[in-house]
């Protein structure tokens, strides 16, 4: 009963992740894998104290983590695990004056063996073609090059 209450509260925030899984695997396959706990979707707040061994871990929307949250997440990685962290530093929604853990991680972890960064541009957008044009327009307005 308690678990359902937590799930009911956090599900709206995790909706984009569910949508991506449904698009990739289909509803039934996703549901089956979640019932078997092969796939677990959990808010970052519930990671403290855990060690995730033999797992493929995804932290989505990481631009909105604080430096403390990012460090906590990164130190959950256990043996046999890989982690992928995604985020768009042009879409930070943190309160003014709060630093992004994703930006800090880029600086702190640059050059650390076993860690790699991949950067995408408007050309990598896999949404409606108009979205690519919107991103390019914002980049031009901010003085960025394609």
Protein language model regions, located:
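Mechanochemical coupling/switch segment within NTP-driven translocation systems
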Residues: 7-41
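Walker B catalytic acidic pair
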Residues: 61, 87-88
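Conserved coupling/interface region of RecA-like P-loop/ASCE motor cores
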Residues: 106-146
């Amino acid at each position: 009963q308690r678990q359902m209450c937590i799930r009911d509260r956090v599900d709206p925030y995790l909706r984009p992740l569910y949508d991506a899984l449904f698009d990739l695997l289909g509803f039934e396959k996703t549901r089956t894998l979640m019932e078997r706990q092969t796939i677990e979707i959990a808010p970052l707040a519930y990671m403290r104290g855990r060690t995730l061994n033999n797992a493929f871990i995804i932290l989505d929307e990481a631009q909105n983590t604080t430096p403390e949250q990012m460090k906590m997440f990164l130190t959950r990685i256990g043996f046999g695990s890989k982690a992928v962290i995604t985020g768009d530093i042009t879409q930070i929604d943190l309160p003014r004056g709060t630093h992004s853990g994703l930006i800090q991680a880029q600086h702190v972890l640059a050059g650390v063996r076993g860690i790699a960064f991949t950067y995408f541009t408007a050309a990598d957008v896999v949404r409606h073609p108009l979205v690519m044009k919107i991103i390019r327009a914002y980049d031009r307005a901010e003085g960025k090059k394609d």
